[in-house]
């Protein structure tokens, strides 16, 4: 956590990123206190009902540079993509935690099963949550292939979605008159 916060502090971050409720016409870059030179950067504006919206916001103790704005928004998209990869996958309606370690273990088990024509099966993986674990046994190569392919497809789709969101980032929307 400290490794993530310290670089952000060097950019003059006062508060950590937070989700805020406001209106759809909110300015993406706004000086909220000219005397103290406090600025807010906003992104991911999601319209709600009756002109309301939710959005992410980060406060700076100076007018952020274009690089700081870009870095703030892109860093958030990267973190959201990572979170979706880690905790956004379900298999047979059971959540599957796709940490790097788990991805490695799933790949190793799958590769070994393929290389041995299934001789290393069955293999058991723990899915679900710590409070509600589900132990899933894969007894056939076809069964394990189905799981592994779907897990990898989830990762690829999530990465592609994250790339699209970063690709449409438009710094010109942060111009101040």
Segments from the language model and where they lie:
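A preference for well-ordered globular domain cores
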Residues: 2-177
């Amino acid at each position: 956590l400290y490794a993530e916060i310290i670089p952000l502090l060097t950019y003059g971050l006062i508060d950590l990123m937070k989700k805020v409720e406001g209106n759809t016409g909110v300015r993406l870059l706004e000086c909220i206190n000219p005397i103290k030179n406090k600025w807010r950067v906003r992104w991911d504006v999601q319209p709600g009902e009756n002109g309301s919206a939710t959005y992410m916001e980060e406060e700076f103790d100076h007018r952020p540079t274009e690089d700081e704005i870009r870095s703030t928004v892109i860093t958030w998209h990267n973190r959201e993509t990572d979170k979706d990869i880690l905790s956004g996958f379900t298999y047979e309606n059971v959540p599957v935690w796709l940490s790097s370690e788990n991805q490695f273990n799933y790949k190793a088990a799958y590769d070994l099963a393929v290389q041995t024509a299934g001789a290393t099966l069955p293999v058991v993986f723990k899915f679900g949550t710590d409070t509600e674990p589900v132990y899933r046994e894969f007894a056939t190569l076809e069964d394990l292939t189905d799981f592994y392919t779907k897990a990898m497809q989830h990762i690829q789709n999530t990465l592609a979605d994250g790339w699209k969101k970063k690709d449409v980032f438009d710094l010109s929307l942060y111009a101040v008159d």
